[in-house]
């Protein structure tokens, strides 16, 4: 519980503020989460526990969807998710130039650049993703990385997909790059998909520890939640 409500209820409340979404559904393999969501007026569906990735779970939960539909995968541990970021990702997919969209934020420390838990992204000039890696990329051959250059960004765990591409994605087995880096988005690049990237200054706060929960609770209470 965070500030008197289940974590997932806070996430649903934040996501519903995005103006681009027609519906919000929680996909889970835990009946306790379904009960918590429904208690606070949300929608939730049970999905098989053996699904290989979050993307596969989204496709399963969505059921029948059209090729032109846009589906957004939002982590269930981020109650401070910015609704404007969700809307920005959806906007990137409106014209059909990209099959997926995601988000990045600047890397601010050498420790984060080196950490395998921080996923780095190299971008093209139109901010399309060229590659995702747990390694520190791009590698500056001649000097220490200039973190102020704008080249060094970390991936945030939010995705939007065009429906037609999502159908193709879940039919493909994990590729060698995905299995090596343990990054499901590499399957999309391996398939030849174009992934639009939205830059944001918001680093996001996932609730993974009691300390994270306490920090988020202070922020929510400070907002008058």
Regions found by a protein language model. Name each.
Residues 1-27:
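N-terminal glycine-rich phosphate-binding loop and ensuing alpha1 helix
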Residues 25, 31-74, 78-91:
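Short phosphate-binding loop-to-helix
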Residues 81-175:
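Conserved core of the sugar-phosphate nucleotidyltransferase
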Residues 147-225:
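Conserved alpha/beta core of the MobA/IspD/sugar-nucleotide pyrophosphorylase nucleotidyltransferase superfamily
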């Amino acid at each position: 519980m965070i500030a008197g409500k289940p974590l997932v209820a806070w996430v649903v409340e934040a996501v519903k503020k995005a103006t681009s979404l027609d519906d919000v559904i929680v996909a889970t393999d835990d009946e306790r989460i379904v009960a918590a969501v429904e208690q606070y007026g949300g929608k939730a569906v049970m999905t098989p526990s053996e699904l290989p990735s979050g993307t596969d779970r989204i496709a399963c939960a969505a059921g029948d969807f059209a090729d032109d539909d846009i589906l957004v995968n939002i982590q269930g541990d981020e109650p401070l998710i910015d609704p404007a970021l969700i809307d920005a990702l959806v906007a990137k997919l409106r014209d059909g130039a990209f099959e997926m969209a995601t988000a990045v934020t600047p890397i601010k420390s050498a420790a984060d650049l080196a950490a395998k838990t921080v996923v780095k992204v190299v971008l093209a000039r139109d901010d399309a993703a060229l590659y995702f890696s747990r390694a520190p990329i791009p590698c500056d051959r001649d000097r220490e990385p200039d973190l102020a250059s704008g080249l060094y960004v970390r991936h945030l765990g939010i995705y939007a997909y065009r429906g037609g591409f999502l159908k193709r994605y879940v039919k493909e087995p994990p590729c060698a790059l995905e299995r090596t880096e343990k990054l499901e988005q590499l399957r999309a690049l391996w398939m030849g998909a174009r992934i639009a990237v939205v830059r944001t200054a918001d680093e996001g706060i996932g609730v993974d520890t009691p300390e994270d929960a306490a920090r988020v609770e202070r922020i929510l209470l400070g907002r008058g939640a």
